[in-house]
C-alpha cells in the first residue's frame, strides 16, 4: 500500500475501508472545508472546470504538403466548419474561444471530424487541433489568431454550447481589412531601439479593458430592455476595439 501523504489521502483510504465513514463528523467537516468551500471560492473567481483543453492551432497542414509537391487543388481537407482534434470523439460538436475574448463574434462552434490524411501524415497530440482557414473567416473569428503557437480553448460542455448557439448567427465576425505597411529595418542597435520605443507605446491593455467595460454596459442595456439602436451602436464600438486589438498585437512584428 502507498502511504498516505496528506489529510485527504487518509480520508479517502478510510472511505475505501468502510463507506460508513462518510457519516462521521470528521468526513463531513473535511467535505465542507476542503471540498465545497474551495469549489465555491473558485466559482466566485470565475474558475470553472470544464471538459476540454487549450490546443495549439495548426492550420491546413496537409494542404501545405500537397502544395509543396504541386498537387493542391484549392479545396480544404478538413472542410469548412470542421476541426480535427484527438481530445474529443469523432463527430462531436465543440466550442472554441480565445483570449482576449473581445466580443460576441469571437466564438467558434465546429464539428470534430477525424481525417485519415491528417492521421497519416501528422503526428499530432491531444494538445494540437488542426483547423481550416480556406473559405471561412476562422482566424478573425478567433480574435485575430495565427499559427505561431496560438492556442484556443476547446470544450464539448453542453451548457456552454447551448449558450453559444443562442445568438451565433446574429453577431458577425469583426474583420480587419487594414493593410500593414512594411518598414525596412536593419539589424542595428539604432533600429532595435526605435522598434522598442514604438512598441512600448502599445495600447493593447487599454483596448481590451475598454472592450470589457463596454461589454458589461451592453449586457446591462439588454437586461433592461433598451432600444436596439443603442445596442447596435455600442456593439459596433466593441467590434472596432476587437479589430484594434488585433492590429496592436500584430504591429510588434511588422515594426
Describe these PLM feature segments.
Residues 1-255:
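Core catalytic machinery and nucleic-acid-binding channels of phosphodiester-processing enzymes
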Amino acid at each position: 500500500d502507498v502511504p498516505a501523504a496528506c489529510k485527504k489521502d487518509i480520508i479517502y483510504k478510510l472511505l475505501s475501508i468502510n463507506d460508513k465513514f462518510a457519516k462521521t463528523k470528521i468526513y463531513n467537516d473535511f467535505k465542507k472545508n476542503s471540498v465545497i468551500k474551495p469549489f465555491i471560492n473558485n466559482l466566485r473567481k470565475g474558475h470553472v472546470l470544464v471538459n476540454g483543453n487549450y490546443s495549439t492551432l495548426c492550420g491546413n497542414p496537409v494542404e501545405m504538403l500537397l502544395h509543396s509537391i504541386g498537387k493542391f487543388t484549392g479545396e480544404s481537407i478538413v472542410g469548412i466548419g470542421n476541426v480535427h482534434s484527438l481530445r474529443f470523439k469523432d463527430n462531436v460538436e465543440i466550442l472554441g474561444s480565445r483570449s482576449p475574448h473581445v466580443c460576441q463574434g469571437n466564438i467558434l462552434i465546429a464539428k470534430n471530424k477525424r481525417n485519415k490524411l491528417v492521421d497519416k501524415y501528422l503526428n499530432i497530440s491531444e494538445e494540437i487541433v488542426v483547423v481550416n482557414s480556406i473559405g471561412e473567416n476562422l482566424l478573425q473569428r478567433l480574435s485575430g489568431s495565427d499559427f505561431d503557437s496560438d492556442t484556443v480553448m476547446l470544450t464539448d460542455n453542453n451548457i456552454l454550447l447551448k449558450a453559444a448557439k443562442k445568438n451565433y448567427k446574429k453577431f458577425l465576425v469583426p474583420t480587419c481589412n487594414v493593410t500593414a505597411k512594411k518598414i525596412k529595418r536593419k539589424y542595428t542597435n539604432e533600429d532595435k531601439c526605435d522598434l522598442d520605443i514604438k512598441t512600448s507605446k502599445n495600447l493593447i491593455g487599454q483596448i481590451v479593458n475598454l472592450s470589457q467595460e463596454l461589454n458589461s454596459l451592453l449586457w446591462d442595456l439588454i437586461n433592461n430592455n433598451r432600444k436596439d439602436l443603442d445596442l447596435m451602436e455600442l456593439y459596433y464600438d466593441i467590434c472596432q476595439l476587437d479589430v484594434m486589438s488585433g492590429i496592436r498585437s500584430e504591429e510588434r512584428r511588422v515594426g
